[in-house]
Design a protein with these regions (language model features):
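C-terminal motif of bacterial Sec signal peptides marking the signal peptidase cleavage site
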Residues: 13-16
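N-terminal export and membrane-targeting signals
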Residues: 1-9
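Short, well-ordered helical secondary-structure segments
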Residues: 4, 25, 54, 63, ...
Length: 155
């Protein structure tokens, strides 16, 4: 019995120490319609991405969500990336245009032609990284199309 209590106590201590994945919320935070759209989309996000369950984020934010370890991270309400130019090569996943940017250890995908803007960082542990976008597309597709849209698939 003492061993069971010790294990339960250790589990509670460990649970109390785990604060979640550090994910900085978008700055400035979305307001008004954008904040509402992010909150609505977050409520539609899947429980699993690439078969990995949601993971707590810190600080807690209605504009962030994470899955797995290493974490696949979504942030809603970010700014338009500086890397987006009229000649940027985009990928389209389930009708949503994304700007892919290779990182040191994975990819950052940012929506193009949706408002508010969403970014998803996918570590290279999940190759091909763009597969995560398939799982997220249903929720992201609920975000309004930007007008005018800079995205090639909206014309």
């Amino acid at each position: 019995m003492r061993r069971v209590l010790a294990l339960v106590g250790a589990a509670l201590v460990l649970a109390g120490c785990s604060r979640g994945v550090p994910v900085p919320p978008p700055e400035p935070a979305p307001e008004g319609v954008a904040a509402y759209a992010c909150a609505q989309m977050k409520g539609l996000l899947p429980a699993l991405v690439l078969g990995h369950p949601t993971t707590a984020t810190t600080p807690t934010s209605t504009n962030t969500q994470a899955w797995g370890d290493p974490a696949i991270v979504l942030r809603c309400g970010v700014g338009v990336p500086a890397a987006l130019t009229p000649t940027s090569q985009l990928i389209t996943v389930n009708g949503i245009d994304w700007l892919p940017e290779q990182l040191e250890r994975g990819y950052l995908f940012t929506t193009v032609g949706r408002t508010p803007v969403v970014e998803v960082s996918v570590p290279d542990a999940y190759t091909p990284e763009s597969d995560a976008l398939v799982d997220l597309s249903r929720a992201v597709s609920t975000l309004p199309v930007a007008t005018p849209s800079p995205s090639p698939s909206s014309s």
